[in-house]
Amino acid sequence: MKNKERKLKSWQGWLIFSSSMVVVFCLGLLAASVTERRAEIQSIYANKKDKIAPFEARNEMYRGNYPREYETWTYTADTSFRSEFNGSQAIDVLEQRPNMVIFWAGYAFSRDYTSPRGHMHAIQDMQRTLRTGNPGIDGAGDMQPATCWVCKSPDVPRMMQAIGVDEFYKNKWSSLGSDIVNPIGCADCHDPETMDLHISRPALIEAFQRRGLDITKASHQEMRSLVCAQCHVEYYFKGEGKYLTFPWDKGMTMEDAERYYDEAEYYDYIHTLSRAPILKAQHPDFEISQHGIHAQRGVSCADCHMPYISEGGVKFSDHHITSPLAHMDRTCQTCHRESEEELRKNVYERQRKANEVRNQLENELAKAHLEAQFAWDKGATEKEMTPILKYIRQSQWRWDYGVASHGASFHAPQEITRILSNGLERAMQARIEIARVLARHGYTDEVPLPDVSTKEKAQKYIGLDMDGLHKNKEKFLETVVPKWVKKAKGKGLLIAAK
């Protein structure tokens, strides 16, 4: 019995010894692999091929030192991704939802509004949109200030350094056409020398300062969202100098921004049909995302829109900034264990429900504008219309704040539904008050509304000569833009053929 026990113990000892040797061998391989990968990473950063100058805006200059990041950045030119709700291709939103033409009567967005493409298209899309007009063609001047360039190019910080921030904003859009030529890229988010994340646009820094906050104390994880917040926010052009300003002084909710604008008696345009003083929301992506569960749990923009890629011993951020639905295995499924199909269904469900409210709001708001026009024509007084125009202004602000934000119905579905529902209530209230005004003026029938069921019909109704606008834009693209490109190349500002 004792001999048998000794044999068992001996056998067990050899098993333990052999297992230990295998474990030690595997640990050795792992240590060697880790050391090799660390050496590979250190080699990449220690042996940079090119010295990059401060304010270097040419994205191609970063390719030698950061080939992986550069290559994935070039994929932002790809427009093949599709989802149930748009994707990375330019879609004519006015064609899909012609009521928006009515909302923007008297404003450039009624001419042209498409869903955004990737960052590499930023300059080209700015030049092509009808919203920037055709300066220099048949004596036409600028429709927009140079402030419109601020979020389109890493040339912007370079020019701000060269001529000053105030002077940059004061310029006309076309005056910087040969200087703002490289699309959104490296220097917008990175210090060219250290490649640390940095804030290159003064408006975000100034917004923090006015709230008593120091943006330089932000953590690296916070910076992975704040570099996006330089542009993906609500803003306006303040005063005669068109100074880019974020309306965050009173807080970062929709109501806070509205209160800021109301106290400043600010409006973007007077609606040519209803005569309401309208606010045009930009794209309050950052503000709205802060109301969502992901941001509240510390998830950054880059975590989902720039997921990590491992290549050999290198882990780097994918600079193909796009919808997380395009790479769900590297975005959603790094935290969530459900299938892609289930997760995609969850996203679409949130978007569909928000869009139900949005569609109701758009129908009511369009009628409110048209019925207000009818009331004016029937002799309504300014005193009678003032509270109605306030409802319309509030309704459209809530609509625009909700729909202008990219991905809002996913980032913060409860907040977006709240905002849109609030806007719907105000549009309906405006229509009720219009009916009362009309009744006082002896009109009690249903208001006859024009046929604005298509983009073409709506644009014709508000008085746009679309054939002329397109013709002049074509002349602009054929004559003015090539001169900008030639001049930029002559100054050494542009490398790639564009």
UniProtKB/Swiss-Prot annotation:
Q: Pathway listed for it?
A: Nitrogen metabolism; nitrate reduction (assimilation)
Residues bound to heme c 5: 294, 332, 335-336
The Swiss-Prot or TrEMBL record lists the needed cofactor(s) as: Ca(2+); heme c
Q: Where does heme c 2 bind?
A: 186, 189-190, 319
Provide the alphabetized UniProt keywords: Calcium, Electron transport, Heme, Iron, Metal-binding, Oxidoreductase, Periplasm, Signal, Transport
Question: What residue range is the signal peptide?
Answer: 1-31
Report the domain of life of the source organism. Bacteria
Q: What class of enzyme is it?
A: oxidoreductase
Sample GO molecular function, one term: iron ion binding
Q: Which SUPFAM superfamilies match?
A: Multiheme cytochromes
Q: Which PROSITE patterns match?
A: MULTIHEME_CYTC
Q: Summarize where substrate binds, as residue positions.
A: 235, 283
Provide the cofactor note recorded for this chain's UniProt entry: Binds 1 Ca(2+) ion per monomer. Binds 5 heme c groups covalently per monomer.
Its localization reads:
Periplasm
Residues that hold Ca(2+) according to the record: 234-235, 280, 282
Catalytic activity, reaction form = 6 Fe(III)-[cytochrome c] + NH4(+) + 2 H2O = 6 Fe(II)-[cytochrome c] + nitrite + 8 H(+)
What PANTHER family does UniProt report for this protein, alphabetically?
A: CYTOCHROME C-552 (PTHR30633:SF0), CYTOCHROME C-552 RESPIRATORY NITRITE REDUCTASE (PTHR30633)
Role this protein plays? Catalyzes the reduction of nitrite to ammonia, consuming six electrons in the process.
What does the sequence similarity comment in the record state about its family? Answer: Belongs to the cytochrome c-552 family.
The protein's name: Cytochrome c-552
Organism of origin is: Porphyromonas gingivalis (strain ATCC BAA-308 / W83)
